[in-house]
């Protein structure tokens, strides 16, 4: 029975992956590559009335809602509001693996990454980030009872038999490396759904992700899933500092005018009652507000 329930859960979680590889707010599939006009991406999008966003299948940031047949999530819904205020009424989603988001943006498969991507100095050298929309700590998804007693990245280091699951291209692999988790103890998955399945199957003893991601996954599993959130949990300490990640939108580096215009509208929205009400269904609270943290500060961090 547990196996049957597990399969049903994984099927429900992965419908976004099976339903379509692209989506728009008006249920139109995205086809081909973006082709900005000579006037720039922003002008082209305004003229067309629509724009493509790249996303990975990771709730609560960006995922396919199979019931509504559209991409949704905290990052996507904020983008819809901000872009509409900029005169762009339609959003077309392009689904890809997390590790392919930046290459896809650079290849002009889409014009914005809306996936809750953390702002890091390394990524700042590849893309232009907006200011963040949220800040959050880390968590582990483990088997019920947490048999390897993993409550931090450091616990993985201390136990050579422990395997830590991470999503390809996500920040968690970087955190693990910086706290000296051996590469041989890391198991790389293409997405959060696969990581959940990997923990259930014993391929990994813990899946490292944002606390919001783990909360969302646990909210979609039943008592028979055999999983739990590792509690308590201690965020990794890197270069003497506790880690708190900040997610934002990413633009091509030659789309600075677009990024600046987006940022201006974003600043008017983040922290408002409208913003809080919009993201509450995805598990976001005032605790996740980015406060005075900016992309410039995060990009300059050492």
Feature names for model-found ranges:
Residues 34, 144-163:
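Flexible hinge/capping segments at coil-to-helix
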Residues 16-20:
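C-terminal motif of bacterial Sec signal peptides marking the signal peptidase cleavage site
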Residues 117-125, 177-178, 205-243:
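A ligand-binding cleft/hinge motif common to bilobed small-molecule-binding domains
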Residues 21-31:
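Bacterial lipoprotein signal-peptidase II cleavage site
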Residues 135-139, 222-263, 286-302:
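Periplasmic-binding protein-like
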Residues 22, 76-85, 146, 162, ...:
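Extended ligand-binding regions for polar small-molecule ligands
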Residues 29-115, 125:
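Extracytoplasmic small-molecule ligand-binding "clamshell" domains
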Residues 39, 92-103, 148-151, 187-201:
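Short helix-initiation/N-cap motifs at beta->coil->alpha
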């Amino acid at each position: 029975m547990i196996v049957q329930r597990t399969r049903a859960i994984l099927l429900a979680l992965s419908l976004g992956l099976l339903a379509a590889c692209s989506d728009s707010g008006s249920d139109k599939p995205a086809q081909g590559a973006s082709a900005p006009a000579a006037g720039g991406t922003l002008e082209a999008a305004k003229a067309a009335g629509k724009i493509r966003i790249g996303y990975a299948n990771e709730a609560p940031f960006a995922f396919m809602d199979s019931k509504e047949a559209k991409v949704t999530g905290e990052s996507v819904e904020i983008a819809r509001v901000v872009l509409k205020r900029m005169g762009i009424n339609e959003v077309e989603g392009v689904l890809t693996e997390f590790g392919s988001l930046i290459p896809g943006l650079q290849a002009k498969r889409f014009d914005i990454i809306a996936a809750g991507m953390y702002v890091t100095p390394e990524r700042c050298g590849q893309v232009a980030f907006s200011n963040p929309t949220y800040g959050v700590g880390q968590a582990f998804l483990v088997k019920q009872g947490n048999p390897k007693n993993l409550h931090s990245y450091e616990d993985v280091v201390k136990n050579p038999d422990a395997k830590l699951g991470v999503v390809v291209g996500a920040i968690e692999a970087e955190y693990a490396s910086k706290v000296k988790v051996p590469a041989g103890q890391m198991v790389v998955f293409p997405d959060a759904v696969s990581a959940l399945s990997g923990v259930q199957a014993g391929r990994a003893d813990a899946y490292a992700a944002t606390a919001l991601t783990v909360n969302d996954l646990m909210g979609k599993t039943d008592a028979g899933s055999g999983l739990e959130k590792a509690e308590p949990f201690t965020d990794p300490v890197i270069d003497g500092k506790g880690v708190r990640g900040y997610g934002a939108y990413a633009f091509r580096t030659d789309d600075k005018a677009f990024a600046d215009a987006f940022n201006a509208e974003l600043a008017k929205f983040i922290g408002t009652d409208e913003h809080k009400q919009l993201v509450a269904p995805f598990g976001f609270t005032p605790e996740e507000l980015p406060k005075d943290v900016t992309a410039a500060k995060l990009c300059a961090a050492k």
